């Protein structure tokens, strides 16, 4: 019991000493004016918090019957019609006194040349190539549908391009047999003609199976000779020419037989004149 009473007395003495120390500290703070400063700071903080502007509420947009558009410009009607006037005027230009005009587009006829017609056109193109100046590089190209319709892209022989054309993009002039000039764009890294080839193909009605001879007349100029695979005028005239040749051969053989026979009668008319010409 005595021990407990002693511990209680010690605790009470400690609390009394602590209370005195707190009072002395408060008095010391009052002497320094720190207590008043802390109160003024608390009041200023409360005043600033109360006067802070409250955030404005967001406006609620009402969705109407009209379509919502992000762009502020006026809506224009959509047109799916392509305009090639400026492109065609760039593609085709005529030299000298020739008429300057733009060629309108044509629908693909769908006509496909047979294998024999393609081979005949290719061989004629090779013969024409052999008659050109050997100093000018040249090659023969047979047209397929992608060259003359749809994409209008003409790939050139890779070996020819590496030997005679620079590996960059630049303008080239396509000149036909009549001297007509068409501006085109050669793409070196793809070894082909793109811009301008469309106008040349449409102007000359190129079709699948046609053979073209490309002669590099100048570093930036191709002279192009066209051999049509399906030529209606030529096809109509061929049978007549063959018949005339056959009649001529028959008449010549008859004249020779009559001349060789011992009892041959004197020739009259046309056969006599033909035989006299041969002698």
From Swiss-Prot:
Stretches the record annotates as Disordered: 45-68, 233-279
PROSITE patterns named among the record's database cross-references: B3
Iron recorded as keyword: no
InterPro entries associated with the record: B3_DNA-bd, DNA-bd_pseudobarrel_sf, REM16-like
Start-end of Acidic residues biased regions: 233-244, 252-262
Location within or outside the cell: Nucleus
Record's protein name: B3 domain-containing protein Os05g0481400
Originating organism: Oryza sativa subsp. japonica
